[in-house]
């Protein structure tokens, strides 16, 4: 598809949504090392389950406001009253199970940081610090293994498809389509 700026992009990028275009061009597939950003993306990916990523991306600023800018210490400290308040927070997904999972997953994220030194180091444990280049998949042996480990630790909404999408979003799996101006070049 030819875009207004002459660049070819992945087919999933909605040419009518400037926010989505910026996400594709500036964020998706770029290697993330910062644990704060890794945490934010993990929580957003979990909320995306059963919904479109575009829907979640359009609500990201509301999620940031509702979840204290994804401050891990604050989210780890959320109690039942805070979870209940999030069920009416403006602009976010109000699913009770996903809200509870976000708090649970924050605590497990912290446990992983304590075990590995950082969540980035945990991901490196699985990828050997390599970026995997593959397209046309929704899961892989890597996402199967990471998902199984996270679920064993107690994470919710962390199935292999969600984790594959997460690994793509944070640049551990590079999946820009052939012809995309950001695609892998050998």
What is the predicted role of each segment?
Residues 1-186:
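HhH-family (HhH-GPD) DNA N-glycosylase catalytic core used in base-excision repair
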């Amino acid at each position: 598809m030819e875009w207004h700026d002459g660049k070819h992009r992945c087919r999933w990028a909605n040419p009518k949504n400037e926010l989505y275009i910026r996400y594709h061009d500036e964020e998706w597939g770029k290697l993330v090392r910062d644990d704060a950003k890794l945490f934010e993306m993990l929580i957003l990916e979990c909320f995306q389950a059963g919904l479109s990523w575009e829907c979640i991306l359009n609500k990201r600023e509301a999620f940031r406001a509702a979840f204290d800018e994804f401050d891990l210490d604050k989210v780890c400290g959320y109690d039942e009253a805070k979870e209940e308040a999030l069920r009416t927070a403006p602009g976010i997904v109000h699913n009770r199970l996903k809200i509870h999972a976000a708090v649970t997953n924050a605590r497990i994220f912290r446990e992983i940081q304590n075990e590995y030194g950082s969540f980035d180091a945990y991901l490196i444990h699985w990828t050997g610090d390599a970026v995997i280049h593959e397209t046309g998949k929704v899961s892989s042996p890597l996402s199967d293994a990471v998902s199984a480990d996270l679920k064993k630790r107690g994470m919710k909404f962390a199935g292999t498809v969600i984790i594959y999408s997460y690994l793509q979003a944070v640049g551990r799996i590079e999946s820009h389509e052939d012809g995309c101006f950001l695609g892998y070049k050998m």
